[in-house]
């Protein structure tokens, strides 16, 4: 019994560490050939998770001074992650659906 009680604080602290890491990520939903939301503000060093909840493939790219990113094709149900290490304003688009636009403000 003493052994399992000792594990409780460690498990609790481990859970807190995971929760703290999760706070650094923000989820962007791809649905209806659009990003949701269409604009987001984050801190430098944070990550955006792009979750494809559409019925078709997307291909995310960022081509802004300070950050270049081009994903592979992103099938429905998959998630890609983009880190934004520096401050600035970035445009995220989809190669396949050029009207898709997300503006990312990084502080």
Give names to the regions the model predicted.
Residues 2-5, 17-107:
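Extracytoplasmic copper-binding redox domains, predominantly the cupredoxin/blue-copper superfamily
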